Every structure is written in structure tokens, then in C-alpha cells.
Amino acid sequence: ARSREPVKVKKALPEQCSLLEDLGYLVCDASQEDLIVTVPTEISKVFHQLEREGYTERKTRYDLLDGYAMATVHLYGAISQPDLVDIFNRQNSQPTSEEELFPALLRHVAVGAPYCFWEEYIVCGEFEENGFEDVRDLMRQCGGKPRYIPEKDDLLRYADWNYYERTPQMDALTAFLMNEGHQPRRDAEEIAGEIQYACVIEADMEQIYDILGDYDMELDGSAVEAFVKVMMSVKNNTRLWAN
């Protein structure tokens, strides 16, 4: 919207523009070698008005707050709003407050963020499935244990819901899935990520085998024994929500 001229986009990525085009925010011309994208004048005017009113700064700020919510829920499963404010303020020069945090995150919850609010907590949205009973269990297990709080850049890596800590044990699991499970690297890493998450929430082995089943992956007798050995190593070296 800042550009006064049409912008060229590689045709290999047209899906990035399709929703905005359907909404009327973009006009796309695919008749040439590159996809030519233009913002209608009316939309451009609205954008520049929002920009003058500080919209881009607010969005950057709210996206950072969302990143902290995503990262801490991914890392801990649940976190109280005061605790999230405390972590944010320790790592940023411009402090936040619960009064700013709640409405900012509510905007992200409204459009499908993987976390939600429960009492004073921000929690993984999956807890809603059983009426948040598992949150209560998690809080009891955590008690007053000190939290592992990475430095800002390391913490915000967890804002990517597919991110997991690369450890020798996870590398061994990925290699096993490729070599014994005959999975391509991309699928092996995806399966490993799902298994790592299952370990974080302390899922049992039956649930982990269900993950393999979702990918139509079967193991024979000797491979099953080797898989259990690899899995025990992963489980013993995974940071749990309850820790």
C-alpha cells in the first residue's frame, strides 16, 4: 500500500495474494511473466490514513505481545497475565501492562490464535476440550517451581508453534524416522515435531504410536524395540510443561 506503482510478485507464490484479492484489497494481473499486484486507490488512501494515526506502530507492538503469548504458552502450556507482563517488561525497554495486554491479545484470539483466556491465565487452546480441567492439573504440578526463561531472541523462537529445541536426541529421532520409517526428511521432521509436543504434554506411548499411524507408518518387531529406545531418550531430555 506504500508503493505508488504496481509491484511484481513471483507467480510461484500467487496464493499469498488470493485472499487479499478476494477481499478487494489487491488487484492481481497474471497475464505477464510475473504477477503484477496493485493496491486500489481507495485502499491505499485508507492505509495511509491509518499509518498517520499510528496503526503500523500499534500493529508492531501488538504483534510483539502476541509473539510473547505464543512463545510462553508454547513453552509453559499456561501463564498468568501478570507473569507474562513481568517477562515482557524484563526483556523490553517499553513496558506493557495487563490493561494493554488483554485487549491486544483478544484481537489475536478472535482470529484464531492457538491460545485463549482462562480466568487470569493465557493457556493453550487445546485445554478448552475438557473444560480446562487439565490446566488445573498443570498448575498443581507446577506449584511454585521456578521457570526456565530464555533470552528474548531464544524465547521468541517458540512463537513459531512448529519450533522445537534441536537436541541430539531429536536428531536421532528424525534420523530413525528417515532410515527405519522410510520417511522423507520433511515428513520426518514434521513427525518428530509432533512427537516432541506429545512428550511435552506427557502423552503416553499409545498416543505417540497414533502419530505414526496418522502418517501410515508401520514398524516391524526389531524397529519397534529401537523406536522405544529412541523415544525414551527423547522423553528423558524434553522440557515438560509441568517442569
Residue positions per predicted region:
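Short amphipathic alpha-helical interface segments
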Residues: 1-13, 65-89
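Short amphipathic alpha-helical interaction segments
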Residues: 7-28, 94-104
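Accessory beta->alpha helical hairpin/"wing" motif in late/C-terminal subdomains of nucleic-acid enzymes
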Residues: 27-55, 115-137
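Short alpha-helical segments that sit at the start of domains
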Residues: 47-67, 163-169, 182-184
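Protein-protein interaction regions
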Residues: 60-62, 94-103, 114-118
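Contiguous interface-forming segments/domains that mediate binding rather than catalysis
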Residues: 67, 82, 86-89, 96-111
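Long, charge-rich, low-complexity intrinsically disordered regions
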Residues: 102, 111-231
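Cys/His-clustered metal-coordination modules, chiefly Zn-binding fingers
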Residues: 242-243
